[in-house]
Structures are given as structure tokens and as C-alpha cells.
Curated annotation (Swiss-Prot):
Membership in a protein family: Belongs to the radical SAM superfamily. MoaA family.
Species annotation: Haemophilus ducreyi (strain 35000HP / ATCC 700724)
EC number: 4.1.99.22
Full protein name: GTP 3',8-cyclase
Reaction equation(s) it catalyzes: GTP + AH2 + S-adenosyl-L-methionine = (8S)-3',8-cyclo-7,8-dihydroguanosine 5'-triphosphate + 5'-deoxyadenosine + L-methionine + A + H(+)
Length: 340
């Protein structure tokens, strides 16, 4: 009888997903839909446009098989993304299914917060452990200008409700833009002074459909970092499983600032995540190839060994870093199809 090793939470030596550069992948970003109800000017300014051919997004059974296989290979955290994942009618069932997967210890959700005020208690009940909410402005008119939706107050109430329900820290994402976010830095700092929010400023990335927007709105995260350092904020040491964000803290603030700067040297050195699209394609990099189809190996439980072998084999082709610094964003026209 073959002995089955007991996995210890957080032990990277037990991860089977390792690339040629000895990076270990314990984190899966799983998109469950490409549909989004916001029209953010930096992502989908014209709104979601369905493709001419009919698409089928991963169903509940396929997601269950996928999560189980990744967990068996050492994945401990799954982030559910979109589009806007909470638009799926079976969203709660999906979360509950993943939460019942042995080996998965964290289930994070990236959402625009559209349904948060109403549904956060349900999300918590089915197993959402971590939250990332997109809030690109704290000014209602500016927020509507950026997103196409007048939902800021509801989203902010949803965040407060999450704290009331016991969430200890919430990550809030804002895309760093010259005309918008940068001008509101003082507002964001005041907001997090007495709230345990990690306010993450994500540097605008150049994608195929948004070249002109990038040229007019891109602002280096270093600009923000230098200001914060001058005001007494201090860079925090990174833990082994931390992502690419550079986190700053200040003794007078309950919240933190996170800066995600993909154009920085060595940005990819700490990569620990793989992505699967809503249509079942494995993406080794946010700015990479067309993706490797996995759906033919999600038809039955008996295919798990073949699926695991395909994942491990594909990982050996992962590049050491992206090529954004030379203007190559791969095939990515926008980030809505894979959730960033």
C-alpha cells in the first residue's frame, strides 16, 4: 500500500508545481466569467461585448475537478476572478465547492463590489476568506466617470459591512492614473487611516486595445512611493508567499499601501501564481501566450493524473519574466478576460 504524504500548510517543499527557475506555484487565479457589468475606462470602456461565437464558461463539475487537481499538486489558495464573478447565478455554489476541496486553505474574491452590500454575509458563509474590492475613486462623480456606474456609496457600505462581519483586513485596488487616482491620493490616505485596508495602487499596464489610454494616463508607482517614503511610510519585509506588491506602513495609520509595479526590475522573481480562464485555458503569465486548453481533461474524475501531468509539463515552458518593458503585452487586448 502506497504511503500518502501528509501536507503541512505553508510548506513550499510539498508543492509539485515548480518551474525551471525554481519558482513554486501555490496560488491559482481562476476566472469563472468574462462578463462584467462595469465599463471601466482603463479596461472595457465600451462594456462587455460577447464574442461572435457562443462561449461556454467552466461549469461547476469542471471547476471541482480543476480545484481538486491543483490542490493535489500543492495549491493552497484560489482567487476567484472574472469579469465580475458574482454575476454568475451559481457563484455561491462554486465558492462552496472550492471551499470543500481538501488542501485549499484560502479562497479570495476579486470583485467590483456591485453586490457586496447585499450579499457579503452569503459570501462569508460559503467560504470567502479574503476580499479584493476595486475602488478607483472616492468621489462619487469621478467613480461613475471611471466605471460607468453610480455605485460608490453602496460599495463603501459593503466594505464596512465586511468589517462588521469579522474580516480583519480588506484589500482595495485602484488603477493608478494621472488624471484620476493620483489626484486623490490624500483622500485615499485619509480613508485608510483608521481602517485596516491595504490600499493597492496598480500601475496601469499597456494592452492591445488601450495603447492611447496608457500613453496619456500611465504614472509610475515609484512616483507615489517616493512621496510616501518622504512622509514617513516604510517598506515592509516580504514573506515567502507574498505576491509582487511592495507594501508600506506608517505608525499613524491602521491601513497600509500596496504598490504593484509591473515595469519594475525583478517584478516576476516572486511569481507564485497560475491563471485559468473562464473558458478553461491555462495561462502561465498575465502577458503571455494564447493559453493551453484544459477542458478535454475535465470530462471525468479519472483524468486527474493526465491533467496533473499536463500542468507540470506546461510549467516548464514558463518564461522567466514578461516583456512589458519593451512594449510586448502578449496577446492580451484587455484584462477582463482573465481577471488581472
Amino acid at each position: 500500500m502506497q504511503a500518502i504524504p501528509i501536507k503541512t500548510i505553508g510548506d513550499p517543499s510539498l508543492c509539485d508545481l515548480v518551474d525551471r527557475f525554481q519558482r513554486q506555484y501555490t496560488y491559482l487565479r481562476l476566472s469563472i466569467t468574462e462578463v462584467c457589468n462595469f465599463r471601466c475606462n482603463y479596461c472595457l470602456p465600451d462594456g462587455y461585448r460577447p464574442p461572435s461565437h457562443k462561449q461556454r464558461f467552466l461549469n461547476l463539475v469542471e471547476i471541482k475537478r480543476l480545484a481538486r487537481t491543483f490542490a493535489n499538486l500543492g495549491t493552497e489558495k484560489i482567487r476567484i476572478t472574472g469579469g465580475e464573478p458574482t454575476l454568475r447565478k451559481d457563484f455561491l455554489e462554486i465558492v462552496e465547492t472550492i471551499s470543500q476541496t481538501e488542501g485549499i486553505h484560502k479562497i479570495a474574491l476579486t470583485t467590483n463590489g456591485y453586490r457586496m452590500e447585499r450579499d457579503i454575509h452569503l459570501w462569508q458563509q460559503v467560504g470567502i476568506t479574503d476580499l479584493n474590492i476595486s475602488v478607483d475613486s472616492l468621489d462619487p462623480r469621478q467613480f461613475q466617470l471611471i466605471t460607468g456606474e453610480n455605485k460608490l456609496q453602496s460599495i463603501l457600505k459593503g466594505i464596512d459591512r465586511a468589517f462588521e462581519l469579522g474580516y480583519k483586513k480588506i484589500k482595495v485596488n485602484a488603477v493608478l492614473m494621472k488624471q484620476y487616482t493620483a489626484a486623490e491620493l490624500d483622500k485615499f490616505l485619509a480613508w485608510i487611516k483608521h481602517k485596516p485596508i491595504q490600499m493597492r495602487f496598480i500601475e496601469l499596464m499597456e494592452t492591445g486595445e488601450m495603447d492611447n489610454f496608457f500613453k496619456t494616463q500611465h504614472l509610475s508607482g515609484q512616483t507615489v512611493m517616493q512621496r510616501l517614503l518622504a512622509e514617513g511610510w516604510r517598506l515592509q519585509p516580504k514573506a515567502v508567499n507574498d505576491g509582487p506588491a511592495k507594501v508600506l506602513a506608517h505608525p499613524d495609520y491602521q491601513g497600509e499601501i500596496g504598490l504593484i509595479m509591473p515595469y519594475e526590475k525583478n517584478f516576476c522573481a516572486s511569481c507564485n501564481r497560475l491563471r485559468v480562464s473562464a473558458t478553461g485555458k491555462l495561462h502561465l503569465c498575465l502577458f503571455g501566450e494564447e493559453g493551453l486548453d484544459l477542458r478535454d481533461l475535465l470530462l471525468s474524475d479519472e483524468q486527474q493524473p493526465q491533467l496533473a501531468a499536463r500542468l507540470k509539463s506546461a510549467l516548464q515552458t514558463k518564461r522567466e519574466h514578461h516583456y512589458l518593458h519593451i512594449g510586448n503585452s502578449g496577446i492580451r487586448n484587455n484584462l477582463a478576460s482573465i481577471g488581472g
